[in-house]
């Protein structure tokens, strides 16, 4: 009896979720609303650019054997999964992480904590750091970065919320 009740409750819950999804789709003029994903952390990209790209050739070869390939994958995979608009914010975030780490090393301050993700308050990024990131990330990760990223200061770019399409389908195949 308890098993039947639990199965009935589970079926009701699933039916309610499908009904809500259908309502969302039909009100959205044939398109499902997408749920925002948390933004990826860009620390790996900053670490990769500092440790694998900006080092002399001999050190770079040593890193290549140890961890650069993995760091590159961990940087590029989330970058490829976000919208072009969000990539502009990601470029700014990577540039800011590098800037803060360089400032910390210059002034004897501790480096930025690893848990930081992009979308936090922004400082003006030096042009040379931004240029290096803009020249490296798109070709390294085979992604497009919007043209306005090259001319718009990071402090004016608002964090972009991006979505990954829902896996559920709506009634009538509209979504």
Swiss-Prot record:
GO molecular function: nutrient reservoir activity
Signal peptide positions on this chain: 1-19
PTM: Contains 7 disulfide bonds.
InterPro entries: Bifun_inhib/LTP/seed_sf, Bifunc_inhib/LTP/seed_store, Glia_glutenin
Record has Disulfide bond as a keyword: yes
Keyword rRNA processing: no
Alphabetical UniProt keywords: Disulfide bond, Seed storage protein, Signal, Storage protein
Gene3D superfamilies assigned to the protein according to its UniProt record, in alphabetical order: Plant lipid-transfer and hydrophobic proteins
Domain of life: Eukaryota
Pfam family, one: Gliadin
The protein's role, per its UniProt record: Seed storage protein. Not integrated in the gluten polymer through disulfide bonds, unless incorporated by reduction and reoxidation during dough making. Increases dough strength and bread volume, but decreases dough stability when added into a base wheat flour.
Family as reported in the entry's similarity comment: Belongs to the prolamin family.
Protein name: Avenin-like a3
Organism: Triticum aestivum
């Amino acid at each position: 009896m308890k098993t039947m009740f639990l199965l009935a409750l589970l079926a009701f819950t699933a039916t309610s979720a499908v009904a809500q999804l259908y309502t969302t789709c039909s009100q959205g003029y044939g398109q499902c609303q997408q749920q925002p994903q948390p933004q990826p952390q860009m620390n790996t990209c900053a670490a990769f650019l500092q440790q694998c790209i900006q080092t002399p050739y001999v050190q770079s070869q040593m890193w290549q054997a140890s961890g650069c390939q993995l760091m590159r994958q961990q940087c590029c995979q989330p970058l490829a999964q976000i919208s072009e608009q969000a990539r502009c914010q990601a470029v700014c975030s990577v540039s800011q992480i590098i800037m803060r780490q360089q400032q910390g090393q210059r002034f004897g301050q501790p480096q930025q904590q690893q848990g930081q993700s992009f979308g936090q308050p922004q400082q003006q990024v030096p042009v040379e750091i931004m240029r290096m990131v803009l020249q490296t990330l798109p070709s390294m990760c085979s992604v497009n970065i919007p043209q306005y990223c090259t001319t718009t200061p990071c402090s004016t770019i608002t964090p972009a919320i991006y979505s990954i399409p829902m896996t559920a389908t709506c009634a009538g195949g509209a979504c």
